[in-house]
Amino acid sequence: MMKVLVVVALLVTLISYSSSEGIDDLEADELLSLMANEQTRKECIPKHHECTSDKHGCCRGNFFKYKCQCTTVVTQDGEQTERCFCGTPPHHKAAELVVGFGKKIFG
């Protein structure tokens, strides 16, 4: 039973990994922004750094590319602004945990 769970976890990890290789659902304006930023970008944005101006410029982690995660910040004046940072989505963290656990068990 344990082997079946490990195999299923590895399959989920591989499917998730292959889906992270492609570009996520882009709208037309995001695609134009991506093309413009791709020409001027020289380095990727590291984990936990701000990616508000370049949402597709995050670096690659151990297994997956970091995703630009955004939140809305409200200032004391009541003005709302969007702030984004490169981070690991929860489902990628879970996949990395399963792979790490599998490496410990099977060496």
Curated annotation (Swiss-Prot):
Its main location: secreted. GO terms for cellular component: extracellular region. Expressed by the venom gland. Residues 1-20 form the signal peptide. One of its GO terms (molecular function) is toxin activity. Residues 21-41 form a propeptide. Disulfide bonds join 44-59, 51-68, 58-86, 70-84. Keywords: Disulfide bond, Knottin, Secreted, Signal, Toxin. It is found in: Secreted. The presence of a 'disulfide through disulfide knot' structurally defines this protein as a knottin. Belongs to the neurotoxin 19 (CSTX) family. 04 (U1-Lctx) subfamily. This is U1-lycotoxin-Ls1t. It comes from Lycosa singoriensis (Wolf spider).
